[in-house]
Amino acid sequence: MGVGFDDLTRENAIDLCKRLIDEHRSAYMVTPNPEIVMAAWENAELHDAICNADLVIPDGIGVVKAARIIGTPLKERLPGIEIGEAILEYAAQTGKSVFLLGAKPGVADAAKEKMQETYPGLNVCGTNDGYFKDDGPVVEKINAAQPDFLMVCLGAPKQELWMAQNAERLDVGLMAGLGGSLDVFAGTVMRAPKAWQRMNACLLY
């Protein structure tokens, strides 16, 4: 497929995320679906950003099926938002801090409120919408907060490129490119019901 994925179970992936958070070395995780993989074929910078990530997990049943066809099967599909939920739960339990980056103005703040209702004790140490032109002030704002976990929800390929370009400038534990997750957490976009998710039919919902 031109992109190497980490072959992990959900439990293994979450454990690795926890370790990367604890190491606090500005690691980053990407969650490519088939569309992102195809875009990486034509975009060398995106390809490098994905391949240089500390963790590459398959978010999309198409990736899992393609891997099986070419003889490099993956253990399971790992939706990025579900990994994000597990990390938020871990953060709430351990006092780790979280910064929310992305979406339209107001969405990250709404997501913060919902997250803190769902995960009591969660420390959301900062938010910033995704409508910025200059990375510098945003990087400074994030570094001032020193989050353990940075949710980067800028959409692909912007979020993958942003993490790769800024990893060395950031003082965070783990960054994760999680697409439209903030909209889901804020309640402005609904996920497909669990039954649809189990059938891998989310795109039809």
For the regions a language model picked out, list residue spans one by one.
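Conserved small/polar residues in nucleotide/adenosyl-binding loops
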Residues: 205
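N-terminal nucleotide/polyanion-binding subdomain common to many enzyme families
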Residues: 1-77, 81
